[in-house]
UniProtKB/Swiss-Prot annotation:
Source organism, top-level taxon: Bacteria
Source organism per UniProt: Clostridium botulinum (strain Alaska E43 / Type E3)
PANTHER family: METHYLTRANSFERASE, RIBOSOMAL RNA LARGE SUBUNIT METHYLTRANSFERASE H
Designated name of the protein: Ribosomal RNA large subunit methyltransferase H
Gene Ontology CC: one annotated term: cytoplasm
Amino acid sequence: MNITIISVGKLKEKYLKHAIDEYSKRLSRYCKLNIVELQDEQTPDNASEKDELIIKDKEGNKILNSIKDNMYVITLDLKGKMISSEELSKFIDNCGVRGNSNLCFIIGGSLGLSEAVLKRSNYSLCFSKMTFPHQLFRVMLLEQIYRAFRISNGEPYHK
């Protein structure tokens, strides 16, 4: 299984980098992990709705250019489906069974994802109705993917 995480914005905090490194190391026995960081566009404090749409489209184009044709794209979006850790485990297993062994999770920037990215998505997932910093969310996503593999393999971790 190949898993790519495309994320808008660079990690700045060392403690988050350490957490990502730890989960990347743990995941290496289950999948080939590739993390793609894309430069976010600066959003002025007084940005209009039109300005925000332009920024989302620019970030969206960067995301779309990073997606390969053979990838099964999973967007992380507030309008996505909320599922449990067990359901995520089954979902990842089922993707592999159906021949979708190149999963691509997409984390948008502070303004969210463009319509073009949402249209390219094969599945939309929502972790919570709450808003999280995208840097922290990257750690949360990696932890849930790791948990999903542990559940799938019947290994102790999930409680």
